[in-house]
Protein backbone atom coordinates (compact mmCIF):
# COMPACT_ATOMS: atom_id res chain seq x y z
CA UNK A 1 0.00 0.00 0.00
CA UNK A 2 1.36 3.40 -1.01
CA UNK A 3 -0.36 6.63 -0.01
CA UNK A 4 0.93 9.72 -1.82
CA UNK A 5 0.86 13.14 -0.15
CA UNK A 6 1.19 15.73 -2.92
CA UNK A 7 1.75 19.48 -2.59
CA UNK A 8 1.78 22.06 -5.38
CA UNK A 9 3.69 25.07 -4.07
CA UNK A 10 3.87 28.54 -5.60
CA UNK A 11 7.68 28.41 -5.96
CA UNK A 12 10.48 25.89 -5.59
CA UNK A 13 11.93 27.68 -2.55
CA UNK A 14 8.63 27.21 -0.70
CA UNK A 15 7.84 24.07 1.27
CA UNK A 16 4.48 22.76 2.44
CA UNK A 17 4.45 22.45 6.22
CA UNK A 18 1.01 20.82 6.19
CA UNK A 19 1.97 17.68 4.27
CA UNK A 20 5.15 17.27 6.32
CA UNK A 21 3.04 17.51 9.48
CA UNK A 22 0.66 14.85 8.16
CA UNK A 23 3.49 12.48 7.35
CA UNK A 24 5.12 13.07 10.74
CA UNK A 25 1.84 12.44 12.57
CA UNK A 26 1.42 9.13 10.72
CA UNK A 27 4.97 8.06 11.54
CA UNK A 28 3.93 4.51 12.42
CA UNK A 29 3.01 4.13 8.74
CA UNK A 30 6.08 5.94 7.45
CA UNK A 31 6.95 3.28 4.86
CA UNK A 32 3.45 3.48 3.36
CA UNK A 33 3.28 7.29 3.10
CA UNK A 34 5.22 8.96 0.28
CA UNK A 35 5.57 12.74 -0.04
CA UNK A 36 6.04 14.69 -3.26
CA UNK A 37 6.28 18.46 -3.71
CA UNK A 38 5.78 20.23 -7.02
CA UNK A 39 5.17 23.81 -8.11
CA UNK A 40 2.38 25.43 -10.10
CA UNK A 41 5.06 26.55 -12.56
CA UNK A 42 5.91 23.00 -13.61
CA UNK A 43 4.42 21.38 -16.68
CA UNK A 44 1.38 19.34 -15.69
CA UNK A 45 2.58 16.45 -17.84
CA UNK A 46 5.81 16.24 -15.84
CA UNK A 47 3.87 16.09 -12.57
CA UNK A 48 1.44 13.51 -13.94
CA UNK A 49 4.36 11.38 -15.08
CA UNK A 50 6.03 11.56 -11.67
CA UNK A 51 2.84 10.67 -9.80
CA UNK A 52 2.13 7.78 -12.16
CA UNK A 53 5.64 6.42 -11.63
CA UNK A 54 4.99 6.42 -7.88
CA UNK A 55 2.25 3.83 -8.44
CA UNK A 56 0.11 5.25 -5.61
CA UNK A 57 -2.85 3.37 -4.16
CA UNK A 58 -4.25 6.62 -2.73
CA UNK A 59 -3.50 10.26 -3.62
CA UNK A 60 -4.00 13.12 -1.14
CA UNK A 61 -3.41 16.69 -2.31
CA UNK A 62 -3.19 19.97 -0.40
CA UNK A 63 -5.36 22.85 -1.69
CA UNK A 64 -4.84 26.60 -1.23
CA UNK A 65 -6.02 29.76 -2.93
CA UNK A 66 -2.82 29.97 -4.99
CA UNK A 67 -3.01 26.42 -6.37
CA UNK A 68 -6.66 25.37 -6.40
CA UNK A 69 -7.24 25.94 -10.12
CA UNK A 70 -4.00 24.14 -10.98
CA UNK A 71 -4.81 21.23 -8.64
CA UNK A 72 -8.33 20.78 -9.99
CA UNK A 73 -7.05 20.58 -13.56
CA UNK A 74 -4.17 18.32 -12.56
CA UNK A 75 -6.37 15.84 -10.73
CA UNK A 76 -8.90 15.81 -13.55
CA UNK A 77 -6.13 14.69 -15.90
CA UNK A 78 -4.70 12.28 -13.33
CA UNK A 79 -8.09 10.58 -13.08
CA UNK A 80 -7.73 9.53 -16.73
CA UNK A 81 -4.52 7.60 -16.04
CA UNK A 82 -5.39 6.40 -12.52
CA UNK A 83 -9.11 5.65 -12.90
CA UNK A 84 -9.47 3.46 -9.81
CA UNK A 85 -7.26 5.29 -7.29
CA UNK A 86 -9.01 7.25 -4.50
CA UNK A 87 -8.25 10.99 -4.62
CA UNK A 88 -8.57 13.07 -1.45
CA UNK A 89 -8.29 16.86 -1.10
CA UNK A 90 -7.45 18.83 2.02
CA UNK A 91 -6.59 22.36 3.07
CA UNK A 92 -8.39 25.66 3.68
CA UNK A 93 -9.58 26.12 0.11
CA UNK A 94 -11.76 22.99 0.21
CA UNK A 95 -12.59 22.55 3.91
CA UNK A 96 -15.37 25.09 4.33
CA UNK A 97 -17.57 24.07 1.41
CA UNK A 98 -16.51 20.48 0.82
CA UNK A 99 -19.82 19.21 -0.55
CA UNK A 100 -19.95 21.94 -3.18
CA UNK A 101 -16.33 21.24 -4.08
CA UNK A 102 -17.04 17.53 -4.57
CA UNK A 103 -20.13 18.33 -6.61
CA UNK A 104 -18.07 20.42 -9.01
CA UNK A 105 -15.03 18.13 -9.06
CA UNK A 106 -16.03 14.53 -9.80
CA UNK A 107 -12.37 13.43 -9.98
CA UNK A 108 -12.17 13.58 -6.18
CA UNK A 109 -13.50 10.87 -3.88
CA UNK A 110 -13.48 12.99 -0.75
CA UNK A 111 -12.23 15.91 1.30
CA UNK A 112 -10.43 16.02 4.65
CA UNK A 113 -11.93 19.08 6.35
CA UNK A 114 -10.26 21.21 8.99
CA UNK A 115 -7.09 20.16 10.75
CA UNK A 116 -5.72 17.12 9.01
CA UNK A 117 -3.27 15.34 11.30
CA UNK A 118 -5.65 13.02 13.15
CA UNK A 119 -8.00 12.65 10.18
CA UNK A 120 -5.16 11.69 7.85
CA UNK A 121 -3.83 9.12 10.32
CA UNK A 122 -7.23 7.44 10.48
CA UNK A 123 -7.52 7.57 6.69
CA UNK A 124 -4.15 5.82 6.43
CA UNK A 125 -5.30 3.17 8.89
CA UNK A 126 -8.43 2.63 6.81
CA UNK A 127 -6.49 1.97 3.63
CA UNK A 128 -3.47 0.15 5.07
CA UNK A 129 -4.98 -2.31 7.54
CA UNK A 130 -8.72 -1.64 7.60
CA UNK A 131 -8.67 -0.91 11.33
CA UNK A 132 -10.77 2.24 10.83
CA UNK A 133 -13.81 2.73 8.61
CA UNK A 134 -14.61 5.87 6.64
CA UNK A 135 -18.00 6.01 8.34
CA UNK A 136 -16.47 6.41 11.80
CA UNK A 137 -13.78 8.92 10.80
CA UNK A 138 -14.56 12.51 11.77
CA UNK A 139 -13.29 15.22 9.47
CA UNK A 140 -14.28 13.50 6.22
CA UNK A 141 -16.74 14.41 3.47
CA UNK A 142 -16.79 11.74 0.77
CA UNK A 143 -18.74 9.94 -1.93
CA UNK A 144 -20.39 6.71 -0.89
CA UNK A 145 -20.66 3.73 -3.22
CA UNK A 146 -24.03 4.96 -4.50
CA UNK A 147 -22.59 8.41 -5.28
CA UNK A 148 -24.31 10.19 -2.40
CA UNK A 149 -22.17 12.49 -0.27
CA UNK A 150 -21.47 11.55 3.34
CA UNK A 151 -20.50 14.37 5.72
CA UNK A 152 -19.02 13.08 8.98
CA UNK A 153 -18.62 16.55 10.46
CA UNK A 154 -15.52 18.27 11.76
CA UNK A 155 -13.43 16.74 14.51
CA UNK A 156 -12.48 18.64 17.65
CA UNK A 157 -9.43 20.87 17.43
CA UNK A 158 -6.29 19.16 18.65
CA UNK A 159 -3.62 20.11 21.14
CA UNK A 160 -1.01 21.86 19.00
CA UNK A 161 1.81 20.56 21.19
CA UNK A 162 0.95 17.01 20.10
CA UNK A 163 1.91 17.73 16.49
CA UNK A 164 5.34 16.14 15.90
CA UNK A 165 8.30 18.24 14.80
CA UNK A 166 8.43 17.91 11.00
CA UNK A 167 12.08 18.79 10.40
CA UNK A 168 14.16 15.95 11.82
CA UNK A 169 15.78 15.60 8.38
CA UNK A 170 16.79 18.93 6.86
CA UNK A 171 18.23 17.49 3.65
CA UNK A 172 14.86 17.91 1.92
CA UNK A 173 14.90 21.64 2.68
CA UNK A 174 18.29 22.69 1.35
CA UNK A 175 18.01 26.11 -0.37
CA UNK A 176 14.36 26.34 0.67
CA UNK A 177 12.40 28.33 3.24
CA UNK A 178 11.57 26.59 6.50
CA UNK A 179 8.03 27.22 7.78
CA UNK A 180 7.23 26.89 11.47
CA UNK A 181 4.01 27.05 13.48
CA UNK A 182 3.84 28.11 17.13
CA UNK A 183 0.10 28.90 17.12
CA UNK A 184 -3.04 28.09 15.16
CA UNK A 185 -6.15 30.17 14.70
CA UNK A 186 -6.70 33.91 14.47
CA UNK A 187 -8.08 36.40 17.02
CA UNK A 188 -9.72 38.54 14.33
CA UNK A 189 -12.88 38.16 12.22
CA UNK A 190 -11.97 39.62 8.83
CA UNK A 191 -14.80 38.75 6.43
CA UNK A 192 -12.45 38.23 3.47
CA UNK A 193 -10.17 35.71 5.21
CA UNK A 194 -10.68 31.97 5.80
CA UNK A 195 -8.52 32.16 8.93
CA UNK A 196 -11.28 34.04 10.75
CA UNK A 197 -13.61 31.03 10.59
CA UNK A 198 -11.55 29.15 13.18
CA UNK A 199 -12.21 31.18 16.32
CA UNK A 200 -10.15 29.07 18.74
CA UNK A 201 -6.57 30.28 19.08
CA UNK A 202 -4.07 27.71 20.38
CA UNK A 203 -0.38 27.89 21.20
CA UNK A 204 2.38 25.30 21.12
CA UNK A 205 4.10 24.74 24.46
CA UNK A 206 6.78 27.44 24.74
CA UNK A 207 9.47 25.05 25.99
CA UNK A 208 8.83 22.82 22.99
CA UNK A 209 9.02 25.85 20.71
CA UNK A 210 12.39 26.88 22.17
CA UNK A 211 13.77 23.36 21.73
CA UNK A 212 12.71 23.30 18.08
CA UNK A 213 14.04 26.80 17.39
CA UNK A 214 17.37 25.70 18.83
CA UNK A 215 17.41 22.88 16.29
CA UNK A 216 17.17 25.45 13.48
CA UNK A 217 19.83 27.61 15.11
CA UNK A 218 22.19 24.68 15.61
CA UNK A 219 21.83 23.74 11.94
CA UNK A 220 22.30 27.36 10.82
CA UNK A 221 19.12 27.39 8.76
CA UNK A 222 19.11 30.60 6.63
CA UNK A 223 15.48 31.54 7.23
CA UNK A 224 12.56 30.36 9.35
CA UNK A 225 9.12 31.78 8.55
CA UNK A 226 6.50 31.60 11.28
CA UNK A 227 3.06 30.86 9.81
CA UNK A 228 1.22 32.11 12.92
CA UNK A 229 -1.66 34.28 11.70
CA UNK A 230 -0.96 37.15 14.13
CA UNK A 231 2.24 36.30 15.93
CA UNK A 232 2.09 39.09 18.53
CA UNK A 233 -1.53 38.61 19.60
CA UNK A 234 -0.29 36.97 22.82
CA UNK A 235 2.44 39.22 24.16
CA UNK A 236 4.16 36.89 26.62
CA UNK A 237 4.37 34.18 23.94
CA UNK A 238 5.85 36.58 21.38
CA UNK A 239 8.28 38.10 23.88
CA UNK A 240 9.51 34.69 25.03
CA UNK A 241 10.31 33.69 21.46
CA UNK A 242 11.90 37.00 20.49
CA UNK A 243 14.00 36.99 23.64
CA UNK A 244 15.12 33.42 22.97
CA UNK A 245 16.23 34.01 19.39
CA UNK A 246 18.05 37.18 20.48
CA UNK A 247 19.87 35.35 23.28
CA UNK A 248 20.77 32.41 21.01
CA UNK A 249 21.46 34.31 17.79
CA UNK A 250 23.93 32.39 15.61
CA UNK A 251 24.63 35.35 13.34
CA UNK A 252 23.07 33.58 10.34
CA UNK A 253 19.46 32.53 10.85
CA UNK A 254 16.72 35.04 10.07
CA UNK A 255 13.20 34.72 11.52
CA UNK A 256 10.12 36.07 9.74
CA UNK A 257 6.89 36.97 11.58
CA UNK A 258 3.44 38.19 10.54
CA UNK A 259 2.31 40.71 13.16
CA UNK A 260 -0.33 43.34 13.79
CA UNK A 261 1.22 46.81 14.18
CA UNK A 262 -1.45 48.12 16.56
CA UNK A 263 -0.65 45.35 19.05
CA UNK A 264 3.04 46.17 19.39
CA UNK A 265 4.05 47.26 22.90
CA UNK A 266 6.91 49.45 24.03
CA UNK A 267 8.83 46.60 25.66
CA UNK A 268 8.65 44.67 22.38
CA UNK A 269 10.07 47.62 20.46
CA UNK A 270 12.82 47.98 23.04
CA UNK A 271 13.75 44.32 22.67
CA UNK A 272 13.77 44.56 18.87
CA UNK A 273 16.06 47.58 19.03
CA UNK A 274 18.72 45.43 20.72
CA UNK A 275 18.66 42.69 18.08
CA UNK A 276 21.21 42.13 15.35
CA UNK A 277 20.09 43.84 12.11
CA UNK A 278 18.51 41.15 9.96
CA UNK A 279 17.76 38.76 12.82
CA UNK A 280 14.01 39.25 12.36
CA UNK A 281 11.69 40.37 9.57
CA UNK A 282 8.22 41.71 10.31
CA UNK A 283 5.37 41.39 7.82
CA UNK A 284 2.67 43.90 8.74
CA UNK A 285 -0.69 44.28 7.02
CA UNK A 286 -1.86 47.83 6.38
Question: What are the residue ranges of the model-derived segments?
Answer:
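N-terminal [4Fe-4S]-dependent radical SAM core
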Residues: 1-3, 137, 141-182
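Nucleotide-activated donor-dependent transferases that construct or modify glycoconjugates
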Residues: 2-11
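Conserved beta-strand positions
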Residues: 5, 61, 89, 113, ...
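Tryptophan-centric aromatic hotspots in well-structured domains and transmembrane helices
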Residues: 12, 66, 96, 101, ...
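Generic structural signal for well-ordered alpha-helices
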Residues: 19-23, 51, 72-76, 124, ...
